[in-house]
Amino acid sequence: MTALPERQNSTAAAIFSQYEKSAEAGQRPHLGASELGHECERYLWLSFRWAKQPDFDGRMLRLFESGQLAEPRLIANLRAIGVEVSDRDEKGQQWRFNAVGGHVGGSMDGAALGLPEAPKTWHVLEFKTANAKSFAAMVKKGVKDSKPQHWSQMQLYMGWAGLDRAMYLVVNKDTDDIHSERIEFDRKEFDRLYDRAHRIVTGVEPAITLGENAEYFSCKYCRFKDQCYATEAPQVNCRTCCHSTPELDGDAKWSCAEHKKDLTVDEQRKGCRDHRHIPVLMGRFAELVDANENNLLTYRNKMTEKEFQQTVYSSQEITDCQDKAMLGDDLANALKIEMDATVSRGSGFDDMPDDLPWQGPIIVKKPKERAKK
């Protein structure tokens, strides 16, 4: 019999890998109610514009699923004690709300009548799971202080549903204990969140950063950190393109001024060869100095004072270039123009041979064509 290795993780790894493979492609089309209470408005704008794909591993995806699996059990618990729960609309779908032309929305876990604390009052239902530490904080401080995003989410649902109370139910993932808390509708908070949502959807550029550098506590582990404080360029898709606009006439529509058409979600995710980064998203390393009607943009590289152009460099090449000092470099420009070279992902000066003369103007000639036999 073949001896077992000292430690086996193959089965667990395969399970997590399957979660990653089956995860929904791309980011969700709308700005979620669960996000709008986030402390950083810049984060929300970059998220709405798909500036960087969230990178969740299989374990995290399974953890999210565990939270979703708790919802039907809590509904069954409520019905078992005589509470009337409405968790589906007339079409059998989860209750869903949309706002700001369909670009903002969320799915409410349900509404309940007959809760022991107030049997005659309809409540918005919000279900969450938490580890022991977070659970203890919620019990001690309440949801508004310990989980302000959850509190804001319920304010939106109450405002959209026309209800003035919510019931917050949280399950301790370690002990299966349940914390229940009634929440009162705050009209000022609802209006603030709605105005914020409208500002994010219609804004042509993001808000300023929360901190002065990437070591600021709230920024330290943010996925947009390198775009806000370093030279990372955004991912290429229609939402990071200066030609696209979120329209406000319903159905979460986006339009493209370059191709004069409405964009499907799939088209938004793919982008096209005419993509041009929203200039401010390259503001850490480049400044737009000229733009013409032929979609030709000229930038000044802030690191080197050299100029570079789109279409010489595609948006994807700008994003893929790790060392942004390459953009506009004389040899890099010559290689691009004369030899139709391509900047690949992770490119930088360190990847080039040591004997290449990177200083001064260099003219690279096209290779001679081979003589025909």
Each language-model region and where it sits:
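Metal-dependent nuclease catalytic cores that hydrolyze phosphodiester bonds in DNA/RNA
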Residues: 1-124, 131-133, 273, 281, ...
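Short, flexible coil/linker segments at or flanking structured domains
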Residues: 4, 19, 24-27, 32-34, ...
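A generic structural signal for short, solvent-exposed coil/turn residues
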Residues: 102, 116-119, 160, 214, ...
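A generic structural motif
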Residues: 111-115, 171, 257-259
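Conserved active-site beta-strand-loop modules that form the wall/rim of enzyme catalytic pockets
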Residues: 120-127, 164-168
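A short beta-strand motif that forms part of the nucleic acid-binding face
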Residues: 128-131, 172-173, 260
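Metal-dependent nuclease catalytic regions and adjoining charged, substrate-binding loops involved
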Residues: 137, 141-151, 156, 160-255, ...
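Short linker/helix segments within small regulatory modules
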Residues: 260-266
